[in-house]
Amino acid sequence: MTINWFKYASPASFYFLAGRMIPYFSIAAIIFLIVGLYIAFFSAPTDFQQGEAYRIIFIHVPAAWMSMFLYVVMAFWAGIGLAFNTRLSSMVASAIAPTGAMFTFLALWTGAWWGKPMWGTWWVWDARLTSELILFFLYIGFMSLQAAIDDPRRADKAGAIIALVGVVNIPIIYFSVQWWNTLHQGASVSLIQSPKMATAMLSGMLIMALAVWMYSIVMILIRARLIILERERHTAWVSELKEGVLE
Amino acid sequence: MIWWIIKRDLLLAMRRRSDVLTTLFFFVIVVSLFPLGVGPEASILRIMASGVVWVAALLASMLSLGRMFSSDYADGTLEQMLLSPVSLSALVMGKAISHWLVTGVPLVLMAPVLGIQYDLPVEALIVLTLSLLLGTPVLSLIGAIGAALTLGLRGGGVLVSILVLPLYIPVLIFGTGAVEASTAGMGFGAHFSILGAFLLVSIVFSPWATAASLRISMG
Amino acid sequence: MIWWIIKRDLLLAMRRRSDVLTTLFFFVIVVSLFPLGVGPEASILRIMASGVVWVAALLASMLSLGRMFSSDYADGTLEQMLLSPVSLSALVMGKAISHWLVTGVPLVLMAPVLGIQYDLPVEALIVLTLSLLLGTPVLSLIGAIGAALTLGLRGGGVLVSILVLPLYIPVLIFGTGAVEASTAGMGFGAHFSILGAFLLVSIVFSPWATAASLRISMG
Amino acid sequence: MTTGPSPIEMLTARNLECIRGEHRLFSNLSFSVNPGELMFVGGPNGSGKTSLLRLLCGLSLPDDGEIYWNGTDIRKLGVDYRDVMTYLGHLGGIKDDLTAIENLRISCALAGCEIDEDQAADALGQIGLAGREMLPARVLSQGQRRRVALARLLVTRTKLWILDEPLTALDVAAVELIKGILEHNLAKGGMVIMTTHQELVMSTVTVHHLVLS
Amino acid sequence: MTTGPSPIEMLTARNLECIRGEHRLFSNLSFSVNPGELMFVGGPNGSGKTSLLRLLCGLSLPDDGEIYWNGTDIRKLGVDYRDVMTYLGHLGGIKDDLTAIENLRISCALAGCEIDEDQAADALGQIGLAGREMLPARVLSQGQRRRVALARLLVTRTKLWILDEPLTALDVAAVELIKGILEHNLAKGGMVIMTTHQELVMSTVTVHHLVLS
Ligand code: HEM
Ligand SMILES: Nc1ncnc2c1ncn2[C@@H]1O[C@H](COP(=O)(O)OP(=O)(O)OP(=O)(O)O)[C@@H](O)[C@H]1O
Ligand SMILES: Nc1ncnc2c1ncn2[C@@H]1O[C@H](COP(=O)(O)OP(=O)(O)OP(=O)(O)O)[C@@H](O)[C@H]1O
Ligand SMILES: [Mg+2]
Ligand SMILES: [Mg+2]
């Protein structure tokens, strides 16, 4: 019986913890978003080469960063779930996937939108763009595999394997600009070198990145809560929740 | 009766929602692979575009032929179809229609989006889509014959492609031909009428040939 | 033990002699389709050659993934494999090797012949063949993971392509890259070492990941 | 050889022969089954029971001999024969991905008798699957899958039933149930031809035993 | 919880629970099987017999409870357990395209006991397939296919046999044959756990009946 208690307690306590954390992260997301957008559209100077179009960068770059970062986080939690059979981490991984796919799509879309004025075409088959597209397919693969499996335990584990195998793609995306000579911009923000861009631009981008980050956390927590409710619907605490005992 | 078959096959497809999406993704991925293999020069890509999209559609349609009868064969449903008082040709027609609805229609809808990636002009996009709309049902109908003939043979999945691809080729030639004619500023009406003729002929003959093949395979 | 599996799978393939031939025919037909879709200009064809051959090899390999475990699954052999005292990774390695022998090797042997049709110079032909020799086993090994994960899922045949194609793409890029580098007169050694590295990594990890996936799918 | 429709319906086999590979499974096999009669086809494994049943329902052709329904060769009858006959083979024709209800409704529709959701649920309930109607067949037990296939017998209006080992995987209660269903059909003037390795005692009806060897 | 290898070999299940979908098939199920003992698992269709057998052989995990072989959890034993155990499920693992001999040799090799052509032909002869050894399994009758799968029991040297409805599709003679094979294994100190819907009277050995409901 003691073992059972442990097994079921952790998603339950996470459920309530997440519920308490969501408002704070939402507020942070909104604040960062307002400040970031203000800098992006009013404070940052017009670029002398690219005109106003460059302002897409404030969405494009944070979205692209987030898309890769979320994949790594998703693979990490999925891997933990696979290795230690902790159901909560697998649920978190499943909760991350749609947000990750959304940002990948956003990066692709804003990139394409930006490409039209900059390169004169929506799309080129260059290494970074292609590998970002592969990332999108990896997210889709992860989600459709999980959707195709009815048994959640099996879905978690199968998803974990494909997520882990797909991690090889992340360095390929990141380093693609260095490995192949491409049309796409190289990394201009790096921990080792000092930044090459205007401070206002840089700070706007970083703040937008924070906003996107907070937003992701909020979305993931909300989705994780839904997944927990769905998966634990037969347990005592969920039925108590339904009857309002725990409210 | 034919509705029952269509309804059932669509139900089966919907039961795994991913099923419809996956053919589509296969199509998208194949179309996206070529530029990777060939290199990103836009001028070359534009020439290849209609060919690549058509070949990908053809492969996507062919890939899913395996599923058309094989699961019905393995679980004994096909036996029941042969013994059904309903005409086998009608049943077969139903299966071909649902195959087209599940695999062909999504491809037709997706084609313009992919064409944009290859930087095709708007008129070419429209012609490409229409040519697929006329051509993909032919693929499903012809494919049904091949799928029926190779039923129960090991390696059928690949055998079917040998049988079916030669028959697909005329469709491919006139489908891409229409797009090229329109890009070259010539009329594409002739190509469309030929595709239409293919469609009519295959609607008339394919269910009959498929039914006969099924009876032979099950004999 | 691994020999038993290889022997058995080859025996099964030989029992239907058409099986080996059909993958090959598929490959040949796909490669021959493109000039039909794209048009016969030799200069364009030469640029496309390596890409088309590689994509066709990739599709041929992928197409046959469905068969890798599904028949063993359907008739209960896979259950017996999981319960076998022999290490599952070894069994899986055996299956990947026989998959490569049946689908990969014929492609490698056929590639130079097809390359000639596309008017490739001799050096490019050799590089193309060697790149396939290094690359196709990787396709079989990675494919095994996808095939194991989608086991028993409806629409698995297409689902597997979504899972596996993104992972195939790096192999495709470096495989065609080698040919292009050699045509451009640059060294292709770097491409080959990367392909070799892919091969080593997949030999080490794929049997393990596939065995894990099989246990999950059968759980 | 056809002698025009005879007044009573009956299935007649004349001088059937079946050769598989090197083996002559049976030859000179003649029998007839009249309304209300049940025929058990017995014999050891591999003696040709399944092969005979497949001949009788028209799935394969005899190497010699003819099969008549009401005096007309079944090959000539075609659809008319398939209209009055139900065959259930080793394989159930059950789709893993469809629920029990969907499976039943579709297999009935294929057999030319459409039923609605309630009728299907009713039949499944009668055959002991109450509460499992909405489960996909994949998760059903072996015996439950078999029951889904057999449920068709409850709704079909055909006369002649050809059943290949219908009792496989069924528990004792289900065997009784099927016995009842068969008796009901026979009482209505139907005909049943079936194989089974299990004993099945049916006293109230005319029973033929055809033993292949 | 592991108590080190006990002197006698035995299979012990403690407080097993199995949940499928909304249904709790069984819970708090404990039993043990000693050398020379046979356990029949009975119960109506869908009561969880197959599910239990799959737990016992390690193909799936119980929702609660443990299974011990000689006092060690079978999950920890892994290969060592698979070395002493043979499972035959509903599906025979028979390849349509291979001959009976090839099928038998390969399934034995998979089970870790390699046999040569003569041994295989011998085993197939004993189980009543003399003359059919070289036929592809595709053309064998249902009962003959089943016999090919069961022939493994004649050559395996494992102690613990877990058999899911081994008698399906077999004729009376074959049932007797299998009975003999089981008795032989039990006499040697083996253990058998099996399900069946048919009666099988075994007087000379210790028989447990576990009935699920
Ligand atoms: C569909 C098209 C595009 C895709 C898929 C794409 C993808 C990416 C990705 C994955 C990153 C993050 C990588 C990193 O941080 O190193 C990135 C960053 C960036 N992208 Fe794009 N991009 C696209 C189009 C464009 C266009 C058209 C431009 C502008 C000409 C552009 C400019 C940038 C810049 C400036 C960065 C930030 C690089 C840095 O500072 O690290 N991108 N993009
Ligand atoms: N191509 C062939 N060559 C040799 N023998 C064949 C061939 N095809 C079928 N057979 C034999 O024909 C017989 C077919 O028997 P059938 O399936 O009708 O048996 P059955 O009476 O239904 O047996 P069971 O009780 O096992 O279901 C088998 O003995 C099989 O070995
Ligand atoms: N996902 C699920 N949801 C609901 N019920 C399920 C699910 N999976 C399995 N079941 C039920 O679990 C039971 C599985 O039974 P099992 O196959 O072990 O039966 P059995 O005793 O072997 O029966 P049989 O005699 O028919 O072979 C069935 O009653 C089935 O309906
Ligand atoms: Mg039979
Ligand atoms: Mg069972």
Swiss-Prot record, chains D, E:
Keywords: ATP-binding, Cell inner membrane, Cell membrane, Cytochrome c-type biogenesis, Membrane, Nucleotide-binding, Translocase, Transport. Its main location: membrane. GO terms for cellular component: plasma membrane. The keyword Nucleotide-binding applies. It holds the Pfam family ABC_tran. It comes from the Bacteria. Gene3D superfamilies: P-loop containing nucleotide triphosphate hydrolases. It catalyses: heme b(in) + ATP + H2O = heme b(out) + ADP + phosphate + H(+). Residues 11-213 form the ABC transporter domain. One of its GO terms (biological process) is cytochrome complex assembly. PROSITE patterns: ABC_TRANSPORTER_1, ABC_TRANSPORTER_2, CCMA. SMART domains: AAA. It is found in: Cell inner membrane. InterPro entries: AAA+_ATPase, ABC_transporter-like_ATP-bd, ABC_transporter-like_CS, ABC_transptr_haem_export_CcmA, P-loop_NTPase. SUPFAM superfamilies: P-loop containing nucleoside triphosphate hydrolases. GO terms for molecular function: ABC-type heme transporter activity; ATP binding; ATP hydrolysis activity. It is a peripheral membrane protein. ATP binds at residues 43-50. Part of the ABC transporter complex CcmAB involved in the biogenesis of c-type cytochromes; once thought to export heme, this seems not to be the case, but its exact role is uncertain. Responsible for energy coupling to the transport system. Belongs to the ABC transporter superfamily. CcmA exporter (TC 3.A.1.107) family. NCBIfam families: ccmA, PRK13538.1. This is Cytochrome c biogenesis ATP-binding export protein CcmA. The gene is ccmA.
